[in-house]
Amino acid sequence: MEKFQTNCASDVLLDLAGPGGPLHVQLTRAMREAIRSGRLQAGSTLPPSRRLASELGCSRWVVTEAYAQLAAEGYVTATAGSGTRVRNVSGEATRDQPLPAAPETAAGARVLLDLAPGLPEVRAFPMRQWISAVRSAAASVASADLGYPDPAGHPYLRQVLAGYLARVRGAEADAANLVITAGATDAIGLLCRVLRMCGHSAVAVEHPGWHRLREVLTTAGLGAVPIPVDDQGLRAGLLYGHDAVRAVIVSPAHQFPAGVVMSPQRRAMLLAWARDSGGLIIEDDYDAEFRYDRRPVGVLQGAGQSSVALIGSVTKTLSPAMGVGWMVTPADVTPLVHAAIVRPSGPPVIDQLAFAAFLHSGHYDRHLRAARIRYRARRNRLVGAIAAHLPDCRITGAAAGLHMLMHLPVGADAASAARLALAAGVKVANLDVYRFTPIPHEPALVLGYGNLGDHQVEPAVARLELAIRGATSRP
């Protein structure tokens, strides 16, 4: 339908002289404004990426990244054989519009600006693509799939997911050793039951680390042995000093909450400990999909599949509400895992088949590519705002993931800063919450930026500045 083909280059070039930044970001911004203003009309077809790149004098990558970002934001829709069309966004909320008022916390403070870790940008959930995957799954489901589900998860999802983990994360993933769970926490809990069945009494964990992990261990009847984390990750050599410990839970890709990436030397040391002790490494592949300043690091499991159980989920990539997770276990551990499954705990079969379709179609890959662009830009904006408002604070752990660690100046009280920030409508996390024992002389806050709107970064940091100033005593 040639009459609907837009002369996109002339439309967007008018605005490319606006604010700077990478060219693909400028192009995305210009096209977004052209769609909002009506210069790019709903239903019009954008030119092929190769042609637009030629007209703009840029690489094709610039255009494809801009198209992917606009699709993720809901401004355009791409259909095989039909090209990329502008959607009708009149009357629709966009992701840069203010969020609805959030519910009040237990303390009565209304959270307006969410800088707490834990959530991805749920407003950017690829709803249309997910609905398409659900329809595809429902239309093709076999009668046999409507009976009692396989406790390990649907075979087709396990097959597709095994291929994805091998391709993207470098895992040695066999569908026979892959179990679908209700999330990473569910997977870890299942493995903890296996460890208890095998006579384990304690598990080594990262310190500082995810505080709910201790609850999972306690529920399974296991103790937690804290192993310190430094700027290279878990201090794996200290495991040799705990003879009773034969299992450890680690997050090498992006440790929470410190944000560090485990060094190659520590990875090798950890694998050596597993070989020497006959121990099991439980690898939580946390935040692995979001690495901004260098190439992603493959999973530890790919180098030590006989001693590593790999855990993953879509909590940070899509939404925690989906309740989809998985684990890949060593072949000799798999029968024990199956024996420990009291009842299927994974998502419903239709949801499993929908996620398989979502993976197989490439929607998941495209969603992650667009998300990485958004999160990288937001991280840079947040780091810049902190440098401008809080030059006495130091940022670490920002190379990957959706959170960073902000070390407060001498004399600051992190607990007071978090309380004052919450009273001002900004939710943050005190690092001491994730420590086994508080360390008052090393105050720090954990800042998450996954679900914070781009337009909210500056006001959030401005309010946080006042909170930290109010919580800092001067000599």
Q: Where in this protein do the model-derived segments appear?
A:
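Short glycine-rich anion-binding loops that position phosphate/pyrophosphate groups of nucleotides
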Residues: 118-120, 252-256, 316, 452
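Active-site PLP attachment segment
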Residues: 302-336, 347-350
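Residue-level detector of anion-binding/catalytic polar loops
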Residues: 76, 223, 280, 427
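Helix-loop "lid/cap" segments that line or gate small-molecule binding pockets
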Residues: 117, 161, 326-328, 353-361
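Short histidine/acidic/glycine/proline-rich micro-motifs that form metal-
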Residues: 119-123, 255-257, 287-290, 342
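Conserved core of the PLP fold type I
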Residues: 134, 143-277, 289-303, 307-309, ...
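N-terminal basic, amphipathic alpha-helical segments
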Residues: 1-137, 146, 157, 337, ...
